């Protein structure tokens, strides 16, 4: 079975689940990961990094470790994933922007980290009237916490949500914990990834699956307005991810 046939088969199964009932997607092994416009264009299609004075990039912590993390978008097959090396003391505020850039999101919507009943988001995004505390939920300012405050051991997992309308959910896995050499710079590094990020505001999981099916087959879903398919233009390619260009772009975030 070719890659395209595999992709289409997974889309068909996903659509059946949406129509006949939701079934959780199976866990993805890390073995699956190793297959290898704005006017101011850059590989991720993004904007400049917010001024670092808006939040601390790194927090004061002792014994800073080298974390390898893998972020994957939930509910989409084939998996859209990125792998990064980050210092364990990276602030959640800075990490949130790093993850949006690495995935390919344009930072046009709210985002948050979740671990259990603890939610972490930028202070500028917190509005008690819009997001009141619900039964046991504890809200934190992401500027005040670093990654090692919520992940410490290999295998730890945290959720990362983006765009509460389209409702994108990501899983962050702590793949490894290592030590820095004395002369090794402690910085953010993109080291792997595969498949393109969905377009902003395309309608969440269902919308993106519908776009992909049209891209591969030319078939339109019943009841979907013609204008919806304008997302699928000559630049749309679900399998596109320029790893080397993105590595260079992400390295610029360390400046």
Q: Model features per residue range: what roles?
A:
Residues 1-255:
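Short linear regulatory motifs enriched in tryptophan with gly/pro/ser
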């Amino acid at each position: 079975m070719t890659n395209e046939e595999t992709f289409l088969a997974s889309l068909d199964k996903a659509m059946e689940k949406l129509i006949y009932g939701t079934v959780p997607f199976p866990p993805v092994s890390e073995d699956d990961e190793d297959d290898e416009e704005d006017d101011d264009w850059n590989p991720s299609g993004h904007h400049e990094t917010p001024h670092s004075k808006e939040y601390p990039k790194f927090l004061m912590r002792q014994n800073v470790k080298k974390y390898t993390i893998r972020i994957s978008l939930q509910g989409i097959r084939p998996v859209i994933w990125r792998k990064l090396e980050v210092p364990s003391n990276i602030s959640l505020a800075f990490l949130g922007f790093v993850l949006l850039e690495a995935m390919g999101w344009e930072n046009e919507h709210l985002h948050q980290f979740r671990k259990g009943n603890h939610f972490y988001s930028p202070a500028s995004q917190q509005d008690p009237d819009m997001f009141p505390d619900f039964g046991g939920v504890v809200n934190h300012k992401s500027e005040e916490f670093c990654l090692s405050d919520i992940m410490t051991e290999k295998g730890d997992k945290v959720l990362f949500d983006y765009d509460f309308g389209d409702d994108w959910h990501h899983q962050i896995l702590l793949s490894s914990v290592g030590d820095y050499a004395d002369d090794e710079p402690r910085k953010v590094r993109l080291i792997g990834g595969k498949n393109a990020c969905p377009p902003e505001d395309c309608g969440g999981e269902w919308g993106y699956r519908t776009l992909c099916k049209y891209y591969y087959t030319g078939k339109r879903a019943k009841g979907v307005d013609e204008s919806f398919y304008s997302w699928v233009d000559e630049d749309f390619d679900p399998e596109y991810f320029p790893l080397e260009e993105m590595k260079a772009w992400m390295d610029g975030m360390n400046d």
